[in-house]
Amino acid sequence: ALAGAIIAGASLTFQILDKVLAELGQVSRKIAIGIDNESGGSWTAMNAYFRSGTTDVILPEFVPNQKALLYSGRKNRGPDTTGAVGALAYYMSNGNTLGVMFSVPFDYNLYSNWWDVKVYSGKRRADQAMYEDLYYSNPYRGDNGWHQKNLGYGLKMKGIMTSAGEAIMEIRISR
């Protein structure tokens, strides 16, 4: 299984994330997440929080510099009208927390794919408050386009999320 693995940062590609999606099987709402750590420091997993949906894998515990983590989420099994929506948190060796939000909704008549990244001061776990902070603070639409921003603390982000119900999200955190 690829999801839950750590790979060389340079090998994080859409093809790898397509394989992570395929591992999830026939699920109508799912996401493959790849986050490349080019920050110069190491990261330790805090937790993943799901507002809706779930995962079948454990968040990779330790992400050294120049390595990338692979993770996935999916809607609940069965005739459930949920998407794969949540946030994850990594404590960084610089003493701050990397928060990442993803939203692959069930109903595309009302919602779109959204994502965002933020660095929080100190140590913080992913929860409903982190999810809401990221979701309601000018997030990026999953529009098949690359986006970038300065995260503060000497870090920047470049990322992309696809618009499909079987979404791919790739993020690179660098100095």
Curated annotation (Swiss-Prot):
Site (Important in the initial contact with the lipid membrane): 111
InterPro entries in the cross-refs: Actinoporin_PFT (IPR050677), Anemon_actinoporin-like (IPR009104), Cytolysin/lectin (IPR015926)
Annotated site residue numbers, Interacts with the lipid membrane: 141
Domain of life according to the entry: Eukaryota
Keywords: Cytolysis, Ion transport, Membrane, Nematocyst, Secreted, Target cell membrane, Target membrane, Toxin, Transmembrane, Transport
Record has Manganese as a keyword: no
Location within or outside the cell: Secreted; Nematocyst; Target cell membrane
Region (N-terminal region): 9-28
GO biological process, one term: monoatomic cation transport
One Pfam family hit: Anemone_cytotox
Binding site for phosphocholine: 52, 85, 103, 105, 131, 135-136
GO molecular function: channel activity; toxin activity
Region span, Trp-rich region, which is important for the binding to lipid membrane: 103-118
Any one cellular-component term (Gene Ontology): extracellular region
Chain intervals for the UniProt region annotation (Plays an important role in the hemolytic activity): 1-10
Biological role stated in the UniProt entry: Pore-forming protein that forms cations-selective hydrophilic pores of around 1 nm and causes cardiac stimulation and cytolysis. Pore formation is a multi-step process that involves specific recognition of membrane sphingomyelin (but neither cholesterol nor phosphatidylcholine) using aromatic rich region and adjacent phosphocholine (POC) binding site, firm binding to the membrane (mainly driven by hydrophobic interactions) accompanied by the transfer of the N-terminal region to the lipid-water interface and finally pore formation after oligomerization of monomers.
Oligomer status and interactors: Octamer or nonamer in membranes. Monomer in the soluble state.
Domain observations: Composed of a long N-terminal alpha-helix and a core region rich in beta-sheet structures. Before the pore formation, the alpha-helix binds the lipid membrane, partitions into the lipid-water interface and stabilizes the monomeric molecule on the membrane. Finally, it traverses the bilayer, thus forming the transmembrane pore.
Other known facts: Hemolytic activity is 3.5 x 10(4) HU/mg.
Similarity remark: Belongs to the actinoporin family. Sea anemone subfamily.
Protein name: DELTA-stichotoxin-Hcr4a
Organism per entry: Radianthus crispa
